[in-house]
Amino acid sequence: MVDATSDPKQVTRQDWIDWAEGTWTDIKQTDTLNVAEGRGEDDTKHICPLQLGLIRRLVKLYTNPGEIVFSPFAGVGSEGVSALKLGRRFYGCEIKNEYVAAAKKNLAKAERAYKTESKTLFAEE
């Protein structure tokens, strides 16, 4: 369960207005990680990369800072990058080796950028 915020500044007035809408039209379609890095020779084009803005919004709405975000289909690590940016921890699973390699790269970059000590699926114990 997500804790009620004791600090109203955690959700801005504009965020509340945007999020209360029935349709989220402010999500940029091009705000995605590079899924081409995870594509193998025999793969077809990934036709539906997930927008980071949507992921960030859902992570912020349904988790608290410090909690774990789990993605059973981690892909190139979009959920993990968004989770780390928002101060959450991340665990993910991915079966495809090319996506695992891309996710490792994206998560390492996010860990450096957001100076997190959180462990990810790809961190060494």
Model-derived regions, located:
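Class I S-adenosyl-L-methionine
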Residues: 1-125
